[in-house]
A protein has these predicted regions:
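Charged, often Cys/His-bearing segments associated with DNA-binding zinc-finger transcription factors
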Residues: 1-31, 38-39, 314-317
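Polybasic low-complexity intrinsically disordered regions
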Residues: 2-5, 28, 52-53, 57, ...
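Helix-centered, glycine/charged polyanion-binding patches within enzymatic domains
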Residues: 3-7, 11, 211-212, 217-290, ...
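A positively charged, amphipathic N-terminal helix/segment that binds anionic biomolecules
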Residues: 21-35, 40-46, 51-71
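Amphipathic, well-packed alpha-helical segments that form the structural scaffold of globular domains
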Residues: 34-42, 122, 272, 276
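Active-site-adjacent structural elements in folded domains
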Residues: 40-46, 88, 161-163
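Phosphate-backbone recognition surface of nucleic-acid-processing proteins
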Residues: 83-102, 235, 241-250
Length: 318
């Protein structure tokens, strides 16, 4: 007889996924998020009762953290006991199928709850003094579509477009974000087609309370736009002009100033790294800008919690 037959598990090492879920259990504002979603949840008058709302919210978060499709999330719940424990499935409880998981996502999309999820999470972070709002860093990143995303007529998503970056063409969308200049936490998210110029979205990435904005050379001309006045724009010098400046007496001083600005701008890259590398969101998952932008808002909201989790855990233990 094996130890597993007796119900004994001699393994004590926790995986990175288990550690992450344990951390998220303690730092996520579960109560506030449920209060946000509950008024929109369907109520069954007859037939089988709907799945527990808290369970479905946790499954939705699992999908974002580990890059799971609806089908993959269903299968993961069957395969991994620690997933079931995290979402609250025990004993003989039913496991939500892919259709139920899909319907919950559609519920969030239908009632435009993803921006509000970002607001709820940021309110928690602001309460801990992690969002100062005195400065903003803006930037955008390309998120390509998978090469096989065509409909039955062989046509690509009409809401996505192609653009050239360097010597390479990309087909997909852009995620534009505004982050807190001090903490690097995201406060604003906008999704557009890939061919939209960054500078056209710069003003929309500001929350209105900042006094200074940092941006790369792609935002040249932003201070001259009518909708972007009233703040101090610190925009990177174009590479060609920066190279010429090195030949002038002020070159060394200007180079130091550019390096200081680059150090602040670097914080905007951290959320991009989290959603693309940590959460695995390197390609768009759905068709259409609305659905993909909604997912991006949830991803960046969860990336804020992920980036601030060490501070939140420390304060929770204090």
């Amino acid at each position: 007889m094996k130890q597993t037959d007796l119900g004994l598990d001699m393994s004590t090492r926790r995986t990175r996924k288990q550690i992450l879920l344990d951390e998220m259990e303690h730092v996520m504002p579960w109560g506030e998020l449920l209060a946000l979603i509950a008024p929109h949840a369907p109520v069954a008058k007859t037939g089988r009762p709907p799945f527990n709302l808290a369970m479905m919210l946790r499954i939705h978060c699992l999908q974002q953290w580990f890059g799971l499709s609806d089908l993959a999330a269903e299968e993961a719940l069957f395969e991994a006991g620690f997933y079931r424990a995290f979402v609250g499935i025990s004993g003989t409880q039913r496991i939500p199928d892919r259709v139920s998981i899909l319907r919950f996502r559609h519920l969030l999309e239908e009632h435009d709850l993803s921006p509000k999820i970002l607001e709820v999470i940021n309110a928690k972070l602001a309460a801990h003094g992690l969002l100062l709002k005195t400065g903003t860093v803006v930037d955008a990143t390309l998120i390509a579509t998978p090469s096989s995303t065509k409909n039955k007529n062989g046509e690509r998503d009409p809401e996505m477009h192609q653009t050239k970056k360097g010597n390479q063409w990309h087909f997909g969308m852009k995620a534009h974000i505004g982050v807190d200049a001090d903490s690097g936490l995201v406060h604003t998210v906008i999704g557009t087609a890939a061919n939209v110029n960054d500078v056209t979205q710069g003003h929309a990435l500001l929350h209105g309370e900042e006094k200074i904005v940092f941006a790369d050379a792609g935002y040249q001309g932003a201070p001259k736009r009518d909708e972007a006045t009233g703040v101090d724009w610190q925009i990177a010098m174009r590479p060609g002009k920066r190279k010429q400046q090195k030949l002038t007496p002020w070159g060394a001083l200007m180079e130091q100033a550019e390096k200081l600005k680059a150090g602040v701008r670097a914080k905007v890259e951290h959320p991009f790294r989290v959603i693309k590398r940590q959460f695995g969101h390197s390609k768009v998952r759905y068709r259409g800008l609305a659905k993909n932008t909604a997912q991006l808002m949830t991803l960046f909201a969860l990336s804020n919690i992920w980036m601030a989790r060490a501070v939140l855990l420390q304060r929770a233990k204090a």
